[in-house]
């Protein structure tokens, strides 16, 4: 660790059990992928994710890719809800040490303001019923069977409207917001403000994801983000990358989806303790410049 706990930002390269390292506060990785997403490891099964989370001390992990039919089928068969918490555990697991939260990343490509827009959005579902209803709608109108992270010809505000029409506690927020090609603030196809991206649905956006190429200190420089909850997650495409970025929350002994949702929605800084950060300098999009001229700013 190169920075003290009081700065609420961790930077690390080598780690073993984060739960022990962080004095047993809950580590949440809210953005990962399955073996069905493009360029992702075939080892990303629910059983392997559970085991890796136990090894690393990750308490709550995203399922990723719940819109992909084969993966959703695995989720339904291999996971079971813990009470009525909206969190899930592996059926064959010995205990509830690792809890799964239903999530997916959607790639939205559409036109707005006379420009082509490409934005990746995180969607977290409150339960299987809500996720299934969203899947059924998307399967009727879009192709969700070609990739774990499907491409939809839908706008950001329309997605928010759709999710909230199914269940009011869907959590929708922009992923890796600075990525140039597929992000809310992307230089190639993004927007200049949160409001420009989400229009009349902006009031329902409660968070944003930093992405690997930026850290909290960089994002805190933009005042329009001040009212939103900053989240950092791994976007893992393989097991070793789980929790390379993550969030550390102070949760109850028996956490629920609703507890996590409310903490993020209200930006409860008493419960959001800090994030675990990858070195942003190693992110693909950290520096500006011109590769052909060997110039980096």
PLM regions and their residue ranges:
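Histidine/acidic-residue-rich catalytic or RNA/ligand-binding cores of hydrolases
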Residues: 38-40, 72-76, 182-189, 220-221, ...
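Cys/His-rich short segments
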Residues: 272-297
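Divalent metal-dependent hydrolysis catalytic cores, especially in the metallo-beta-lactamase
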Residues: 51-71, 171-173, 207
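Short, positively charged and aromatic/hydrophobic N-terminal segments
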Residues: 11-20
């Amino acid at each position: 660790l190169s920075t003290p706990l009081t700065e609420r930002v961790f930077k690390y390269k080598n780690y073993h059990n984060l739960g022990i390292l962080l004095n047993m506060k809950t580590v949440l990785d809210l953005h990962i992928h399955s073996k069905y997403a493009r360029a992702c490891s075939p080892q990303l099964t629910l059983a392997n994710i559970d085991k890796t989370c136990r090894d690393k001390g990750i308490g709550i992990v995203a399922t990723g890719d719940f819109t992909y039919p084969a993966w959703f089928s695995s989720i339904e068969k291999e996971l079971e809800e813990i009470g009525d918490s909206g969190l899930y555990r592996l059926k064959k697991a010995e205990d509830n040490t690792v809890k799964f939260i239903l999530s997916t990343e959607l790639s939205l490509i559409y036109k707005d303001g006379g420009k082509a827009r490409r934005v990746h959005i995180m969607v977290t579902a409150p339960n299987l019923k809500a996720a299934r209803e969203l899947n059924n709608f998307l399967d009727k109108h879009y192709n969700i069977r070609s990739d774990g992270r499907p491409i939809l010809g839908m706008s950001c505000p329309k997605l928010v409207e759709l999710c909230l029409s199914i269940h009011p506690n869907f959590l929708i927020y922009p992923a890796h917001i600075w990525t140039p090609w597929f992000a809310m603030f992307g230089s190639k196809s993004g927007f200049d403000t949160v409001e420009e991206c989400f229009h009349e649905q902006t009031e329902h956006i409660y968070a944003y994801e930093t992405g690997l190429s930026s850290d909290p200190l960089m994002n805190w420089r933009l005042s329009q983000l001040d009212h939103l909850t900053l989240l950092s997650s791994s976007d893992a495409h393989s097991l070793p990358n789980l929790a390379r970025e993550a969030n550390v929350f102070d949760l109850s002994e028996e956490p629920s989806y609703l507890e996590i949702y409310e903490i993020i929605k209200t930006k409860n800084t008493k419960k959001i303790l800090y994030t675990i950060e990858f070195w942003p300098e190693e992110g693909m999009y950290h520096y500006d410049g011109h590769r052909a001229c060997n110039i980096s700013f």
